[in-house]
Design a protein with these regions (language model features):
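P-loop NTP-binding core
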Residues: 1-308
């Protein structure tokens, strides 16, 4: 499963969501790769800390190879690096990506990332792609390479306005390049349950037919602490409420995905245009119960093991 976490508005928690879902996947037994397409390298730093600046080769090296004709080209897995977390790898970013964009667009290399990640599918159960917060070559490459898309949503008017334009961009990619791309849902981030505006905004999205995922992710200072320690929440704060929400979100996504494959023999198509009136009339499968999904006494976590 190749899953892109996409929003062309910055500050909505895109990298945080991608890395924490990836970490929960890995902690649950899956083999996971995070692909950091953002020249800022936030996901790379989150997973490997300051050592991320020294990693070589990186995605910039991969795209250099795409632009050139090396005598002995590296295979995609040669650009991958391990992290200190079991079963969790990273294909790291580099600031040079920003300088490569124009050349890659001019030579129409937009399918090269997809080709590389399809080759890596054999080694991983999940590939999480973190593109830049803008609609550019790297973002389009990510949407073409992905099988599914998660959309982070921060509860403010700017995010809501951007959301509908974003769905149009996804639909254009589906029409022109990647007909199989599905929208798994909207991930509500930094949610304040006691504030009226966030509640109203989320309810409006639901009323308009958008697939809003549950649980909503709470706002917490623990996110910044986990950034500082370069340890996703499942490793840095395993018992925290927000960590439990990430576990439940991952479980809900997995349940939905596995049920869809079981029922139809193929991936569930949740693609939609803005203001789509109906995605599905069936109730979504429940997430794991607290006894299955949440940390228990003694710091251990009970899991439903991932089965590739």
């Amino acid at each position: 499963m190749r899953r892109v976490v996409f929003n062309h508005k910055g500050g909505v928690g895109k990298s945080t969501i991608a890395c924490n879902l990836a970490a929960v996947s890995a902690a649950g037994g899956a083999r996971v790769l995070v692909v950091d397409l953002d020249p800022q390298g936030n996901s790379t730093q989150y997973l490997v800390g300051k050592a991320g600046r020294e990693l070589d080769p990186t995605l910039a090296g991969f795209f250099d190879q795409v632009l050139g004709f090396p005598l002995k080209p590296k295979k995609p897995d040669e650009f991958v690096h391990g992290t200190r977390f079991d079963r969790l790898d990273v294909l790291p970013s580099h600031p040079a990506l920003a300088e490569q964009q124009g050349k890659l667009e001019a030579r129409y290399k937009i399918f090269k990332l997809r080709e590389a990640l399809v080759e890596l599918d054999r080694q991983y159960d999940f590939i999480y792609i973190d593109p830049p917060p803008s609609l550019n070559f790297f973002t389009r490459s990510a949407l073409i390479a992905a099988e599914s898309c998660l959309i982070p949503f921060d509860c403010d008017n700017f995010s809501r306005r951007a959301l509908y334009g974003l769905l149009e961009d996804i639909d254009e990619i589906r029409t022109d390049h990647n007909a199989g791309l599905m929208v798994e849902g909207v991930v509500v981030n930094q949610f304040l349950p006691r504030a009226r505006l966030p509640q109203k905004m989320v309810q409006d999205l639901i009323d308009e037919g958008l697939p809003v995922l549950q649980p909503y992710l709470a706002s917490s200072v623990k996110v910044r602490e986990s950034h500082e320690s370069a340890k996703p929440l499942i490793y840095s704060h395993p018992k925290h409420k927000l960590t439990q929400q990430y576990v439940a979100l991952y479980a809900a996504l997995e349940t939905k995905r596995q049920n869809a494959v079981r029922e139809s023999g193929r991936s569930l198509d949740l693609s939609l245009r803005p203001f789509l009136k109906a995605v599905s009339t069936r109730p979504q499968p429940d997430a794991l119960t607290p006894a299955q999904a949440l940390p228990v006494e003694g710091g251990e976590t009970q899991w439903t093991q991932h089965k590739p």
